[in-house]
Amino acid sequence: MESEIGCGIDLFFGGGTFDFIRQAQAGRIVDSGVLKRHPEWFSDAVIPQRFAGEEYWDREGRWIGTVLSAYGMVFNRESLRRLGFPGEPTRWEDLTDPRLRGEVALADPTKSGSIAKAFENIIQQQMQRRLRELEQDQVGLPAAERERKAVVEGWLAGLRLIQLAGANARYFTDTSQKPPIDVASGNCAVGLCIDFYGRQQEEAVKRRDRSDRVGYVSPVGGTVSSVDPIALFRGAPNRAVAEAFIDYVLSMEGQKLWNFRVGITGGPDRFALRRLPVRRDFYAQADWKAWRSDPEDRPFESNDPLIYRAAWTGGLFREMAFIIRVMCLDPHTELISAWKAILEATPERRAAALAVLQDLDAVAYDEAGGTVKRALMSRNKVDEVELGSRLGREFRQRYERAERIARGEAP
């Protein structure tokens, strides 16, 4: 493609890599030349091409990651103390704690791509954990079989975790920006969110109320760091200025703006951005730690990193969101009621009812890649509607049965 006909806009900036890859494939974004102007930036020591399974820049220079995004939990310390929750949440499993019943804020993964990605991270962590267990316990099993077993079992473990988080949820909202706001106001105690929504809410409360009641955490080993890229549009009317801006954003001066505190030399003048720079050498500057908004965050250093494997769930992203909807959102009233009954039941009834509640064979890994995928890819949209209706009905009936068992009304 040699044409310089464009849309009249210079830069495409922000969001996840998915849209940038699509625009690159369509020929709408082009090589900005930054790889040639600053080859010293594009190495494992500065901006690695790949890290933990995620791509950080396009080898043809069409898009470059500028800042990192991860997922985690925003929480209200005052609400947690009121509920008797010990300390602060640190693991995805904390979303299932019975003390948080009715206090978790979640978003609909079929409406929010960022929240769907967070749910995918939860499932991937369970798969990775299961693989490590099998590598220890079933050494004689061929590697391919171990991986297959880990993926299938980890898929169910992840869905079960999400199901109980959904049982604790006050709601599933259409917008991923709502949970941090509700957590800050005390309407919910914990919310699932993208990192900068949580950190910016924490910053806003500190600035406005001079309060530390809001916090944010990315679970260790529970989330990957993906990038928000920048790209040059084909036919950019102000190409020289746009290229200079790309260079600035990736320079150390530009990177400081993302995470330096307000008033610090090199930092923002009015508002802290609370984003994590993409440059690995930024975190190597020990003397900058006191000037950073998030001095303890070191995304390139982890004893238990989550390595994203697209082959495991990347092809089931839409199917996963659909399954969470029919499992948690559509029968939410029945799920909440069953969970309440289970928590109030005797130990024996609780175990029996929970086994029924968490029987997810209908949405197992092979079903997701088979029945569910076929319905979602069908040209006849009625197929998707009918499957959603059938699965939603089956989950409602399952939850009602689990509740009856918990209350001693069914065998």
What are these regions (language model features)?
Residues Q23, D182-A184, L232:
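Hydrophobic residues within well-ordered alpha-helices
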Residues L335-P411:
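C-terminal non-catalytic accessory extensions
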Residues V74-S79, S225-R239, L257-W258:
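A bilobed periplasmic-binding-protein/Venus flytrap-type ligand-binding module shared by bacterial periplasmic
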Residues I9-G14, F172, A189-D195, Q200, ...:
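Paired acidic/hydrophobic, glycine-rich loop segments that form the ligand-binding mouth/hinge
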Residues G8-T173:
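Extracytoplasmic ligand-binding site segments that recognize negatively charged/polar headgroups
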Residues F233-N303:
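Mature extracytoplasmic/periplasmic domains
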Residues D19-R22, V190-S211:
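A ligand-binding cleft/hinge motif common to bilobed small-molecule-binding domains
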Residues Q138-G140, L159-A165, D209-A236, D281-Y283:
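Periplasmic-binding protein-like
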